[in-house]
UniProtKB/Swiss-Prot annotation:
Keywords: Cell inner membrane, Cell membrane, Ion transport, Membrane, Symport, Transmembrane, Transmembrane helix, Transport. One of its GO terms (biological process) is iron ion transmembrane transport. InterPro entries: NRAMP_fam. This is Divalent metal cation transporter MntH. The keyword Transmembrane helix applies.
Length: 412
């Protein structure tokens, strides 16, 4: 009897710990449903129907492993990835890492900020510039929550993630995809043309985000509840739940685009404005409005996460920090320049995703080295299969980046 009670108490304590430590992965997961994902998933679904859904499944599984490793580094060492690189690498390498990480954070922010501005433009009928002003105001308001600590921010960003997921459940209801074909697309790999290969690379680039690899390790480095093993176990639950939601959203985006556009002959839908305007007559005004609202929610939350990641990168690499509102103001500038110059926002979005994919390997290689180091990680060191899988992901990402670069240079 006593033994049973002890087991029950232990189970209750583990559940409480899981709940207490839930949140960091929800902030990281927002990076996986930003407007760049909207653009690439819609283009892939409209062009190839359900044929590239399997890419989303595999990219999401890879992303889960990467986020677990990042969170584990923070738990095991009490330092984030940027700080570990600063402590272990020569100064010129650290400065190179800082500069490229800042460029990638700004490229990410450009995509996310413009995505939210497009969302405001679509649902309110304002200009893109007015949408950008609204985005700026909204992100400043969300960032003010940081003064109250990490938990309130986790709740707001987690709420926005759940809103986007709910919006796409509704979109699936409106578009009514063929479930048998959808299941086949998720399970059976196919790359019918060279364009499909490029879109698959784009989907992978838009799914795995280098800035949240840096950020997640900083969100877990100051967790102190329970033992290290208990914190790691709770964090795996956090990542599994948050990344499953993000994966569902990505699958739903592509499936909705396939059902609404591809099978009604609109295979060339590639821009967010175009997707909104095409959804309205095909499905309904409500479906188009929900799409616009989900774009605003994803853009706002991901641009806030991008600002936080930029702060972590600067503090970690060069031990220097600026107020969050100053960073927010500085990183907004490129978005306003793009809008005022009248450049094509969706093209800028897609280009930023290509740039992003080059930062993935640069973040992954040191992450794998550090998490495989027994002296650093103790009992949380990577197992042999995690090492092998991690290096396989690095090789795949580098190969796809070279493919993308060559293809872009040759205009394929």
């Amino acid at each position: 009897m006593n033994h049973t009670r002890v087991e029950q108490n232990r189970g209750r304590t583990a559940r409480k710990l899981r709940l207490a430590l839930m949140g960091p992965a929800f902030i990281a997961a927002i990076g996986y449903i930003d407007p760049g994902n909207f653009a690439t998933n819609i283009q892939a679904g409209a062009s190839f129907g359900y044929q590239l859904l399997w890419v989303v499944v595999w990219a999401n599984l890879m992303a889960m492993l990467i986020q677990v490793l990042s969170a584990k580094l923070g738990i095991a060492t009490g330092k984030n990835l940027a700080e570990q690189i600063r402590d272990h690498y020569p100064r010129p390498v650290v400065w190179f890492y800082w500069v490229q990480a800042e460029i990638i954070a700004m490229a990410t922010d450009l995509a996310e900020f413009i995505g939210a501005a497009i969302g405001f433009k679509l649902i309110l009928g304002v200009s893109l510039l007015q949408g950008a002003v609204l985005t700026g105001i909204a992100t400043f308001l969300i960032l003010m929550l940081q003064k109250r600590g990490q938990k309130p921010l986790e709740k707001v960003i987690g709420g926005l993630l759940l809103f986007v997921a709910a919006a796409y459940i509704v979109e699936l209801f409106f578009s009514q995809p063929k479930l048998a074909e959808l299941g086949k697309g998720m399970l059976i790999p196919s790359l019918p043309t060279s364009e499909a290969v490029f879109l698959a690379a784009g989907v992978l680039g838009a799914t795995i985000m280098p800035h949240v690899i840096y950020l997640h390790s900083s969100l877990t480095q100051n967790l102190h509840d329970g033992s290290r093993k208990e914190r790691y176990s709770a964090t795996k639950w956090d990542v599994a739940i948050a990344m499953t939601i993000a994966g569902f959203v990505n699958l739903a985006m592509m499936a909705t685009a396939a059902a609404a556009f591809h099978f009604s002959g609109h295979t060339k839908v590639a821009e967010l404005d175009q997707a909104y305007l095409t959804l309205e007559p095909l499905l309904s005004h409500a479906a188009a409005t929900i799409f616009g609202l989900s774009l605003v929610a994803a853009g706002l939350s991901s641009t806030v996460v991008g600002t936080l990641a930029g702060q972590v990168v600067m503090q970690g690499f060069v031990r220097f920090s600026i107020p969050l509102w100053v960073r927010r103001a500085v990183t907004m500038a490129p978005s306003f320049i793009v809008i005022l110059m009248g450049l094509d926002p969706t093209r800028i979005l897609v280009m930023s995703q290509v740039l992003l994919s080059f930062g993935i390997a640069l973040a992954l290689v040191p992450l794998l080295f550090f998490t495989s180091n027994k002296a650093l990680m103790a009992e949380l060191v990577n197992t042999p299969w995690v090492k092998r899988t991690g290096w396989a992901i690095v090789v795949l990402v580098v190969a796809l980046n070279i493919w993308l670069l060559v293809g872009t240079a040759l205009g394929l």
